[in-house]
Each structure stands twice: as structure tokens, then as C-alpha cells.
Amino acid sequence: MTTPVQSYLEDLHARLAQDDSGTVADYIPELALADPSSFGIALATVDSAIYEVGDTRLPFTIQSISKPLTFALALESRGEMVRERVGVEPTGEAFNAIALDPLNPLVNAGAILTRSLLGPDPDGSLLRGYSAFAGRDLLIDDRIRESESRTAYRNRAISHLLRGAGRFAGEPDEIVEDYIVQCSVLVDCRDLAVIAATLAAGGRNPVTGRRVASPDTVRDVLSVMATAGMYDAAGDWLYDVGLPAKSGVAGGVIAVVPGQLGIGVFSPPLDDQGNSVRGVRVCEELSHSLDLHMFKHAHRGPSPVRRTFTLAELTSKRQRDPAVAAQIAREGARARAFELQGDLGFAEAEQVTRAVLETPAEFVVLDLRRVRNIHESAIALLAGLADRISALSAAPRELARVMSAQPFDELDRALEFLEDRLTGDTAAPALVRLADHPVLRGISADDLALLEGLLEHRFFAAGDYLLRAGEAVGELLLITSGVVSETVELASGDVRRVATLTAGMTIGELALLTGGPRIGDARADTEVECHALPADALAGLHELDAHLRAILLRNLLEIVAARSARTRQDLTTLVD
């Protein structure tokens, strides 16, 4: 099944593929051979989900996207020395400007100096470091390396200028060759997304689980990427897109949504600043439509899924016939609830959609009563689950409008709906005989005849109150048909259902046994018939028929115990 995120990316790719503006870099002869129609987009989340569309497995050279990785590796191995030698200021100049002052590690002067700090690399440790970020073994494209080496006049000039000023020791031409090697590492679009996601995850690769950089190092790298990663367009980029990013002249772009996901794009045609035209547009659209600008979100909150459970673990407050209850216990795994929380943006909705699509449950309810805000991007993603969601609880109108799911004001009603779907139990069965009522289980025919003489028949229309909160309870009601809901009023003034009762159940047993007043209302949802056993009649049985009274009290205690067990379950699972 195509996920909502995948559908979104496929639509984005199809639209932006029509943009044929820009030119392929040709100052390195081998780069000029790239197909301008090549185009791939990949997203990788910090919990290892990866989405791809287009030419995501087409290899190309990493070029300047290597710079933040080398900066990270230098910070890890050389520490404060790097900050003392290389600045972090934006330049406002071309990336390959011949400059003595290495203002930041993402322009060539700073990148060459940063590379020099790592020293010679005979055993390929730099490549292994890049591979750790990508989550797989990377290779070097010797054709690109040789082609770039033949035309690296500006980089050699920069290196000699830096060496002449005493900025590093060693041979300047050798440093340039080392720098060219790092730019010639082969990656694909998926690699870029994983690299970006590793930075988004604070230095832990979400695919391999390996930590490749410390959170402090990642903080420093992302800070420079945010202010200098897109060459002399970095200021506009940070203002408009608001994501740390880095581009390369082979057509790659990475962008990082801290704490959430990484973006990788490949498309060779470049704009006047040397950035991939389609790559820039992809990041712009993702940032705007998915609300990813990093300064709009101070931090990532807790998991958007507060809790999830099946009907085998927790049912609604509706009390069922024993046979139906047993069916729910057996088949409850076919229905699952997801309680959501916090602010739902794109990243949070992506987690929710993935969780829903991964569950084997046939019936699903989303409960949104703890969701503070829901962004349009989250609504769009969740709408893609329309055929998987059976019910919504406390959903905002804008979400309910785009879903075909049955809406409910509270989760308990939604759970009852799922139970009905699961079992087909939508009607309230009427008892054929009063003798079938569980309260009368185990009594003889003679005792039943005696008891029928004490019972009073009652009828209630839908909406009538059978009992009110605070009233003294003077009788036990035995329901023989219809549906009754018991509710309590919370301190907030909200009314919460605590039980829904049907034929074969009782009302007032606890208050009758304890002598206390009612703590909630009992109201007829449908027409209700019941039989009332007055409290004084029950007390009089002590002298009239002590055995019958003992049976009735035993049955009532079993009912109270069963309801108490359900109350404990609710408390254990924090249902409120």
C-alpha cells in the first residue's frame, strides 16, 4: 500500500520534474556528462523510516556536501583546534573565492584548511567516517577525482595562499589532492537522506543505530550549515526555508530538520549560486507545505502516540452479554485504538500513519482529545488513511471533514462502535423470561414465584432518568430490555460515561448494599423495561425466605465484584 508520505513525494516529484531550468556544472569536465533530467528525492526519519521517489539510487559525487562531514570528523578528532583555526562566519562570496581568511568550513578556503587538520589518510579513515554517516560502505569515483584534479587551479591557488600565510603545515598540492578525494566520494540520493537524518538525530545513524558524532559536534555543524551551507544564498535560504542545508555542484542537496528527519535531493542542473534548482525547490516546498521551518518549533515533543491498545486489552464502558464479551476477548486484537497527543505536524503525522499502516488490526480508532494543535500537513497525511480508520474521537472539524470515519465526542463511544463492528452486536436483546436474569440465577421455581410477587414493573422512555446522582437508593432495578447509560459529572462540568447497561444487568446494587446515595445518573438511551425490587422487600426476605435472600445477595456481590474489577482495569490503564 502506498503511504500518504509516499503519495505526497510522488506528486511533488512529478510536478518539479517539469522544471528544466538551470545548467549542469561543466568546470569539471566529467560533471558535464550528467543527465539533466535525473531527479530523485529521499526522506529519512530519525526513527529509520525512508521514503524515496525518482532516481534515488543513481550514484553521483558528493562534492561540497562532504564539507560538513569533514568538519564533523575534524571536530571529533581535533576538538577546539578546529574552531581556533577555521571561522564560522558567512562570506557573501562565491564558494571557490580565492581568500586568505577561511571564514567558515563550507567554502573552499575553510574546507581545505579543515581537511589539512586531519592530516594524511593512508588507511582511508575519512572514507570510513563518511560511510558511517551514510550507513553503508562508500567508494571513490576515480574518473571524477582525476578530472577535478586536472582543473583544480583555483583550489591550488587557495591552498598555496593559506600555506604561504602559515595557516597549515605540509605540501599545499597534497592537501588539495586530499580535498579532491573527499569531493569524489560516490553517494546516491538515499545516502544523502540518511546522512541528513544522522545529523537530525544528533549524530546517531537511524539505520545502523551507530553513533558517529557527538551531539555537541552536530550542533556546531548544523549551526554553520544554517548560516553558510547554501553559498551566497544562505541568508535568503535561512529566512525562507529555515533548515540547515548543504549543496554540491554535482546536483546534490541535503537539508536537516533537527530531531525529525533528513532530506536528500539529486538533480544536476544548477542555479546562478551553484545550487540544484530542483533541490532548492523541493526543500522550499517541503518546508512551506509541511511546516518544517526550524524556528517555528522550539523543540520536538514526546511521541505523538501516547498509548495504543486493542479491544482485547481494554473495552468500552458498555457491559455486554457474556457470550458477546467472550467474543470481544477472543477477537479484540482485530480492533486497535491510538491515543494521540501534543502538536501534530508533518513529522508527528508521519509517525502516526506508519504506526497505523503497520498494525494488522481491521478496525482502527484515532483519539485526538489530547492533541493541542494539528497542522494542515498533518491533516493531509492523516486523510490518506481514510480507508484504514473506522472511527475518530474528539477530532477537530477540519480533520473529520476529510475522513470517512465515524466521529465521536469521546473515546469510549468510539470503542463501543468498534465492538459493534467486531461482533455485530448492535441491538439490545430483550430477555424472554425474568428467570433468565443473572440476579435470579440459582433460585427455584417456587422462589421465583415468590419473588415475582414482590417485583414492580417499570417502563422508561428514551431520555428518562431512572436514578439521579445524590438520591437515596430504595430499590434494585433489573433491566429486561433497552439500554441505560450511567454517567458522572466531573469537576470540570463535563459528563463522563462510566457504564452502559443492557438487558440482564442491574442498576443500584452498590448503593443498595452499602446504603449510600447514588454518585451518578442513570438515564435511558432507548425505551427501557425493568423490574424493581424494593429495599424493604429484600430486607423482609430475611424472615420470609432466608435462603432466597442469601442467593440474591450472593449474585449481587458477584455483580459488584465484576464491576469493581472493571473499575480497577480503567484505573490501571489511565482511562479518564
Question: Which residues fall in each region the model found?
Answer:
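STAS-typified acidic loop motif
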Residues: 312-354, 368-372
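Amphipathic alpha-helical interaction surfaces in cytosolic regulatory modules
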Residues: 342-406
